Structures are given as C-alpha cells and as structure tokens.
Amino acid sequence: MQAARIAPSLGRQLLRFGGGSSRPTALLGQPWPGPARRPYAGGAAQLALDKSDSHLSDALNKAKPAKAESKSFAVAMFKGQLTTDQVFPYPSVLNQEQTEFLKELVEPVSRFFEEVNDPAKNDTLEMVEETTLQGLKELGAFGLQVPSELGGVGLCNTQYARLVEIVGMHDLAVGITLGAHQSIGFKGILLFGTKAQKEKYLPKLASGETLAAFCLTEPSSGSDAASIRTSAVPSPCGKYYTLNGSKLWISNGGLADIFTVFAKTPVTDPATGAVKEKITAFVVERGFGGVTHGPPEKKMGIKASNTAEVLFDGVRVPSENVLGEVGSGFKVAMHILNNGRFGMAAALAGTMRGIITKAVDYATNRIQFGEKIHNFGLIQEKLARMVMLQYVTESMAYMVSANMDQGSTDFQIEAAISKIFGSEAAWKVTDECIQIMGGMGFMKEPGVERVLRDLRIFRIFEGTNDILRLFVALQGCMDKGKELSGLGSALKNPFGNAGLLLGEAGKQLRRRAGLGSGLSLSGIVHPELSRSGELAVQALEQFATVVEAKLIKHKKGIVNEQFLLQRLADGAIDLYAMVVVLSRASRSLSEGHHTAQHEKMLCDTWCIEAAARIREGMAALQSDPRQHELYRNFKSISKALVERGGVVTNNPLGF
C-alpha cells in the first residue's frame, strides 16, 4: 500500500504534488478562454454572449501576447473564474466501436465476480484463490490499459473505469491486487518507459505471467518523500547501479517479480559541478538477485491482498532500467499516483452501488412496528444520502477519466478531489448500511462488515486524504497567487494593461463589494436545473472571495496555515461536486434518460446542501477573530495532550 510522499518543506513540496503535469502555468495577460457553449441559451442570447466575450478577448489580446490558459474548472474556481470547457457538457468520449467492445467485456467480467470469485473465502484465507487469479488472467484483467500490440486489452481510461467499478462492487481486495499491479505497479513503464522497456516487460505483465509492485514507502518515510533512505549508487563503469534499502507495506510485495523502485542517487549539477542526492525511479527484477520480502502483513482489511516488506541488498540494476530521467523520480512517482486516482473513485462508486443494493433489499423486507422500515423517515433520509454520495463519486470518476481521454494534462486537483470524496463517501455509505441493517449488519454473513474493513485503507494510501486536502488547497492557491501577483504588476502600468484591469480587477472589486462578478451558468445547465446552477455560481463567488482575502493576508505564509487550507479544500470539494452533478444531470435531462427526473432530484438536493456548507464555511473563515480563537485552542489542546501523553482531564469521580 502506498501513500503519496512529500519532501522536506511540506508546503513547497505540496505545490509540486501534481508533478509531471505539462500544464502551462496560468499567467496574467492571457486571452479570455473561448466563449462557453451554452446549449440551453437562445440564439440571440448566445450571440450577445459571444460578442461580449469577443470584445473582452480583443482587449486582453492587445494587452499582452496570448498564452495558453488552463481549462481546468478546479484551477479556475480558486481564481473566481467559471471555466466550463472540461465540465460542460458532461463528456461522452467513447466512440461506437469502443462502446460495443466495452459492452462485450462488462457481461463476462460481472459474471466472473458473481459466479467464480468468492470474496468471503478470499478474506478468510487471506489470499486470492488461485482459480480466481487464473480466471482474471484469462479475462485479460492484468493488462487492461496495456496496448494490444504488447499483449494487453488496450482500454482507454473511461473503459478502464467501467471495469474497475465492477471489481470494486464485488471484492476490494482483488481490486487492490489488480490495481497495485497495473494502476501503480507498472504504470510508470506505460507513462515513462522507453520502447525497449515496454517491449521487454509489458507483454508478461499484461498476461499476468509476472506481477508488479510500486515501492515508495519506507519505515522512515510516509508522506515525506525526501526522507527515503534506499540508495542506488552508480558503478564506476556507469553500466549499473547498486541498490540497497527496504520498502514497507508494499501491495503485491511478496508476489511481484517486477518492481518500480524509488531510490536516492547522486546527481551532478552540470552548471556548478555540485553533487546532490535526488530521487530516481528504477525498474527492478526479482531475478537480479538480492531482492527478498518479508512475511505477509496482518491487516484490518483487504486481507486477501498481499502486503509485505521488500528488501534490496546489493541489487545490481542495469543503467538502462532507469525509469524516466536520473533525478526525476519524484516527478515519476507523483505522475503515476495522479494518473491512477480516478480509478479509485470508479472502484468505490462500484462498492457503494453494491452496498446500497444490500441496504435497500434489507429495508424493503424488514418489518418493525408493523411497517416495512423503508417507510420510516429516518431510513428514507439515510438511503437518499447514500445514493447522493454514490452519484457524486461516480460522476467525478467518469468526468476525470473523460478529461484524461480527451488529452487534458491538467486534472491533478480534480483527481485528488475524486479520491478524497470517493474514499470518504464509501465509508459513510457502508457505515449507514450497517446501521440500517442493525445487528444483522454487524454479523459476518452479509459481508458488509468486511467491506467496511476493506474500505478503511482507502483514506490512507495513494496519498492520505489529509495530505491531499493540503495539495488541493495549495495548488489552487498557487495559481490564484500568481494571478494576484500579475495584477499587482499590471497596476504599475495601468494604461498598458487596461483590458486586463477592466476584466479581472473589475470582477474582483465587484465580488468584494458583494455585487457579484457577472458569472452565470444560464444556458449551460439545463433549464430545470437553473436554480441549482445559480447556487453553484454564488458558492464559487463566496469561495473565491475568501481565497483571495486569505492570500492577500498570508501571502507565501499560507503554506503553513493548515487549519485554513483544510477548510478551503472542503469548500473546493463541495464546489467541484456541485458542478459535476449539474453537468451529468443536465445531460440526462437533455437526452431524455428514463432516470432524468431522479437525477434532477439528486442534483438539486446535493446543490442545496453543498451551497449551504460553502456559505457557512466561508462566512466562518471571514470572521477572523473567532477562527483564530478556534485555531489557538486546537493547538493548545493538542500540545497539552502531547505533554501529558494522553487525555489531560481526570475521571469525574477523581480516581
């Protein structure tokens, strides 16, 4: 199991957490993004909008040379901008051939997990049965995204998400075995491997003949990548590296033959000649010799997956097995993790779908007080909230996968949000299922307690949710901070930057005055969702106002304001969730899906509550004295606990 790692300066490294992105930095003086398509706007309205956008774009184009701007909604929302390119309309990326191929896979994969795989038995044995592994190999499940010419199934991200959702619905431990293998284990070879590396390793990995593992965590390094101690020293001849060290809690660690390993290597600065230690990624074969593993770890959940310590003792790794460039290992690791997070959201959407089915089945058959319990308001609210969480998670997963399939390189914040939201939503949904089932839910036979145990790890590995919240907030604030810096420079030459100042500065002044910035989703969301669209825009403006105020106040020091950053991240998560469900429900309404009105209710209900949370959360952040008192109390209480070694207060009885 892997947690995302952060280097010594927490704030600085968090801003690199989206590593590997080729997204151009957002700069001031860029042209206004192309006019948003408003499928529900009348012709005259769209013409007026286009004309308005055109005038502003001309003004900005005259101000400074045009440069590409991020199309990420999440990046833009921190700046108070409504960038809809990647979120409206809800993306449909599969062509007819891809859709038909996927349909041919869904049925046999579903049937396999219903008829062959036994999750309860896997859990008891604490291993995946050999018949299951063999069946998965025959289905091609070990190489879903490996190109067909290299022996894989060749799926795009959206197709992969659909199959992962099936796995997550039935057995998370099997999902970890498959995910540790292909989502992170050999993903580096797919993303950064040379032609020779791909041809050498991917065919056997895709067939399942060999398994892969991702080796980053060490005993002394959890969320701090720079503290890894595993080293790789180049030989005098330059033909190989000698690898020494150990990696902890590695999924597939006791089964894998191929490892993506991260180690410190000496790197010489060509300009100064100074030698620094930097992280480098390697493809390591067990067959190189010197690679061993410890016994399987005893765990709370995902017991059927193999988790073990992996040790490297004088392993000679050929220089051609460097993955990416020497010294670029942090970038490689972060890119791998960023690239796979949508898959976790898809899997957990499947988990929730299965759990909700169990909850509904119980609620429709259990009779208490002479009534089936689904008729009681408390149960109805639980079921409604459970399915809202599933709908949001699923909407996020397929939004991000589609963005990736469309060629976006700027999805890091969205992917992190989907992982945070999905892992927390799945826990809540499963916990509520147990509550609905009462004592029966606590029993082993229904299998819900196993799912709850399996789920707990998802908030920890591939980036703990705490670290990812800091990343979401800091990455968003970084882009906004650059914009504020650019506005400051523009003010020094107001005549040369008139278009810019009239555009962005005007919006900011109106927002600060509570007048709104003129943003609207009118004509973009379906007319039946117009009120929810208005709530989303209001929430965005409230959120952006606070982001700007806190950046102006703290400047670079914001990296140390973790109490604040956590709350900004929560607002960002709610805001992104509002937009993805608005988009998905709009598509269902416009295409006349039979579930459209149900989706409208899910969307409206989510938006009402999310808007209220954002409004209350941002209002609290704006009342500085009270917030500062809270933060001081948190620090003081925590300090007292640490000094005491536990609870400070005595028992009320005094002994």
Curated annotation (Swiss-Prot):
Subcellular location: Mitochondrion inner membrane
Requisite cofactors: FAD
Recorded metabolic or biological pathway in which this protein acts: Lipid metabolism; mitochondrial fatty acid beta-oxidation
Pfam families per UniProt: ACAD9-ACADV_C, Acyl-CoA_dh_1, Acyl-CoA_dh_M, Acyl-CoA_dh_N
GO molecular function, one term: very-long-chain fatty acyl-CoA dehydrogenase activity
Modified residues (N6-acetyllysine): 51, 71, 239, 276, 278, 298, 331, 482, 550, 556
The enzyme's E.C. designation: 1.3.8.9
Positions annotated to bind FAD: 214-223, 249-251, 464-466, 562
Domain of life where this protein originates: Eukaryota
Keyword Transmembrane: no
Phosphoserine PTM positions: 517, 522
Subunit structure: Homodimer. Homodimerizes after import into the mitochondrion.
Family: Belongs to the acyl-CoA dehydrogenase family.
Designated name of the protein: Very long-chain specific acyl-CoA dehydrogenase, mitochondrial
Gene that this polypeptide is encoded by: ACADVL
